[in-house]
């Protein structure tokens, strides 16, 4: 552990942004004119006109979150006593740290080998000793139970039935239906989508002679299939307008007026009030791009309507969306998009990526490595197109193209779209790098703000886009701030430094609170006056768009992503100093307490946001924008559940340590009694929080989203272990069992060892560390009492009663359990099951 040396340099009174861009700064405080005009973060090394003082880091945990938690949350200010009495003169050191390592990010599963992102679920579970213990045991227990059952069936030649006592109840009883659903979906989607992603075969549409049906893949065949979706003009127009109002504001990647000009050339109204697709004539490639984009848009709208609880044609809409998605995929392949790279093909690729990513039939609750690889590839396409540069630098467009204003708007939107996707997908994963950061900065190096750039083309820009760009610029700067933060946490080469990380967190939260202050109605604050803007479409018949609700939705999503990110960082800092405390508790315990406390603060903020979104003052956001934003919300729910599970494992092991200590002394002293009581209360509170989230998933998400249905099954099993007081015993007993050393299960041990990096050869040292009272020694009475006060002060925690446990119990009846699903599961080939259960055991 080393302390960074700081060299004194002459202070600069120019703001950091102007200094970086090498432009003149008027040094106005607190925001210079240049930064104010571009809505950028303005910060100074030294406040102009004042004495240079080194910034101090307060001893109290991070200040209370503004405008977000109920009034009761402000009571947490009284809990800062955790650091005040004993550390009045304590000064935080700028430690060099390694918050992530390659070993914990390695994924070896089936035929896949990757190094994952720092905050990917697999990385988080590997990095945390107690999370790794739980997931390894669940994964291996599932596979061994399956193998044992097969052995019994083979030996006795009897019907496949599981006759287990309650004490033998394992995770199989909870995941059987999820596993069957996973298999069914895998079979269905493998038939629905060609397994080619964006690596298309080079197929040149223009050499295929579309007027002849002499090829297996013919544009005429696809157009004939598409024509049945254009029989009703009003329905088609309505679906396009629905897209403009629900998907486009969140992902504004196209130029509406340009798109509708192209549609008018492509679609011809017939005598039956339907559309004919006119593909004859010149510029057939542009028409192919237009029909592809239109097909994707219709698939979006049908998919969103299939999720609407108020519509009676949900199933048929889902089928139509799947069929249109498949047709769009074939059209993209026909376009040979990488041979003919342009703004319109990238627009199609981006919207197709979003359509597949948001598919509710996806089994994953989190971004897969293929999602991340595809997104990074799309960013490379955007860079190849030069979208990271302001379009006005390309002067040949201005002199040679009459329609350059709309093209410039489209180019800006496409770059923003790529970054917004990275904001929603990669930032929560902790994925960042210096090169991406520089490309982000290069786009904003102009003195003009985004609304000002769009106003240059005022005749070609509508009011909706001007309003969207003001919000988009704030999202862009927040994305930039989070990229800076993550890059400081996980440099490619070398350590991260504590003060730099904390300073970047403060800057990010300051910007978040300034630009995205979330005001919940539970605070008694009045909601903003509704603002409606006309949808800029000739198809909309002067329909208006509720821009105020959209702004609320963007504010909500910005807070969810930001607090997911900062919670992960504080949790990583807590884990880092927990390990350091094992070596030197006297030096590092204060740091461990601080970051454990702040991690819980951000956890509670995020939990409050999710709770309000499904059951409170943010409920009105779900209908218009739920489909476009559900992946971010579900990802955060999953991360909260993992946070709860790992804390519960720690509390159970701490409880075991406390019980052993009391038993050894033959009495329960006052301090041990207080410790036992606060641990019991914490277990009940965290278990209650987990049940609240599981109840949200079951009641609000499970029926519509396959990933939610699959993931919640494991957490129901964890709740069962908590309710039966068996969470730590489940882990400890497993490592003591004969199965761990049984050579019959060597294949299973090898699979699990590669998956989690913890094979049976390490079982003794691993269990010794889990049960070592020194390892959790810093999770002491002082911090536990402060955490219990903080958690109990929350409104949703105060609703907790002892009776709620029974009302939220899992619906499984273990005494009268139906073996039908398990029997179906056991009939499946073992190799197929080995490929499924790693995904299920990944929480």
From Swiss-Prot:
| This protein's UniProt keywords | DNA-binding, Metal-binding, Nucleus, Transcription, Transcription regulation, Zinc
**Top-level taxon of origin:** Eukaryota
What is one Gene Ontology biological process annotated in the Swiss-Prot or TrEMBL record?
A: positive regulation of transcription by RNA polymerase II
What InterPro entries does the record tag this protein with? Answer: OAF3, Zn2-C6_fun-type_DNA-bd_sf, Zn2Cys6_DnaBD
Q: Which GO terms describe its molecular function?
A: DNA-binding transcription factor activity, RNA polymerase II-specific; sequence-specific DNA binding; zinc ion binding
Report the main location listed first in the record: nucleus
In terms of SUPFAM superfamilies, this protein maps to: Zn2/Cys6 DNA-binding domain
Q: What does the entry list under GO cellular component? A: nucleus
What does the record give as the DNA-binding region? 15-42
**One family name in Pfam for this protein:** Zn_clus
Tell me the compartments it is located in. Nucleus
Keyword presence, Ligase:
no
Q: What is this protein's function per UniProt? A: Required for growth on non-fermentable carbon sources.
Additional info? Present with 339 molecules/cell in log phase SD medium.
Cross-referenced PANTHER family, in alphabetical order?
OLEATE-ACTIVATED TRANSCRIPTION FACTOR 1-RELATED (PTHR31069:SF29)
Listed name of the protein: Uncharacterized transcriptional regulatory protein YLL054C
Q: Which organism is it from?
A: Saccharomyces cerevisiae (strain ATCC 204508 / S288c) (Baker's yeast)
